[in-house]
A protein has these predicted regions:
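Shared catalytic-loop signature of beta/alpha-barrel
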Residues: 53, 60-64, 265, 274-298, ...
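Alpha/beta enzyme core
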Residues: 10-21, 34-59, 66-86, 95-230, ...
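Short acidic/histidine-rich active-site segments
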Residues: 235-238, 258, 278-282
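Extended, intrinsically disordered, low-complexity segments
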Residues: 289-334
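A short N-terminal beta->alpha junction/helix N-cap motif
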Residues: 3, 24-32, 59-60, 305, ...
């Protein structure tokens, strides 16, 4: 067994407490490969932000659990090389669906795990989450639970519809499970196709599609039931239209890809909603840069020549999110 402290990682407990008190959110960026990790760490160090390196079950299988562990350790050392003596980096399992998956991650150095039992009947969700919490807390690993179901598709996570979190359940769930944070459903969705055009209205000034409002009343009700308790929002990519346009310009076929307006996320981050998950925006930034490079340099076959621009574009996006959306910049002394 490898404990996350041996890798120089931290859990989310103190990080979330500071974010709730300070009115900002911690960026939770999903990653699958070295270029994404490099971009995330460089952006976090240069903006002096704590950060969560988030890995789905599918990404862990793709990258290999052993290599992933060393990448996480390397991320800490890379941050120090970049000038941050005391980086705050979490390695988090996103959407763990079984106790065995969560245990495997805890045993291999993860500092935080999510157990997603939201698809189960309520009592089964409580029992599964509690089981993970009891194991994780032995090793000071923090646990994220979930109430409510998000629509959309992302890796193995798939649902045709969303179910809002019931505020009347949150006290019982948090108390009985002992979870350290709670992911809720207020209308966001996984993936780049969060809403259909029929669900949206057209902004007369910009001509862009505006999605239906999120259920902020649910968020407020949850906060009222659990004052100061760390709340998590999944499916929070904004799907930048400039990246979508670049992808489509150079041979892509992303039609009606619509995300969450960034101003909604910034307002949410001022509450107890202290962890905001972003995955699709990273994929879009990477894909846009790669497609553009291939179109402009069709003879190019050196991976460094197209993955380098992809890394730079992702870093730019991560910095923007940290500074302008989440407000977590400047929160580290480094």
């Amino acid at each position: 067994m490898v404990n996350y402290k041996e890798l120089g990682l931290v859990n989310t407990k103190e990080m979330f407490a500071k974010a709730v008190e300070g009115g900002y959110a911690i960026p939770a960026f999903n990653f699958n490969n070295m270029e994404q990790m490099q971009a995330i760490i460089k952006a976090a160090v240069e903006t002096k932000s704590p950060v969560i390196l988030q890995v789905s079950k599918g990404a862990r299988q793709y990258a290999n659990a052993t290599l992933l562990r060393y990448m996480a350790q390397g991320a800490v050392e890379y941050a120090k090389e970049l000038g941050c003596e005391k980086p705050e980096i979490v390695l988090h399992l996103d959407h763990g669906d079984t106790f065995e998956t969560c245990k495997s991650c805890i045993d291999s150095g993860f500092s935080s795990v999510m157990i997603d039992g939201s698809h189960l009947p309520y009592e089964e969700n409580v029992a599964l989450t509690k089981k993970v919490v009891e194991y994780a807390h032995q090793f000071d690993v923090t646990v994220e639970g979930e109430l409510g179901v998000l629509a959309g598709v992302e890796d193995e996570v798939s649902s045709d519809h969303h179910t809002y979190t019931d505020p009347e359940e949150v006290i019982d769930f948090a108390t009985r499970t002992g979870c350290d944070s709670l992911a809720i459903s207020i209308g966001t969705s996984h993936g780049a196709y969060k809403f259909t055009p029929e669900q949206c209205t057209i902004d007369e000034k910009t001509g862009l599609m505006v999605p239906p409002p999120l259920a902020f009343d649910v968020l407020k009700a949850v906060e009222a039931k659990l004052p100061g308790f760390p709340i998590v929002l999944h499916g929070s990519s904004s799907v930048p239209q400039e990246e979508v346009a670049t992808i489509n310009k150079f041979g892509g076929a992303l039609k009606a890809a619509i995300g969450i307006p960034e101003e909604w996320l910034r307002e949410s981050a001022k509450s107890a909603l202290c962890k905001i998950n972003i995955d699709s925006d990273s994929r879009l930034a990477m894909t846009a840069a790669i497609r553009q490079t291939f179109a402009e340099k069709p003879a190019e076959f050196d991976p460094r020549k197209y993955l380098g621009p992809a890394r730079d574009n992702m870093e730019k996006m991560y910095k923007h999110k940290i500074i302008n959306v989440l407000g977590s910049d400047g929160k580290l002394s480094c």
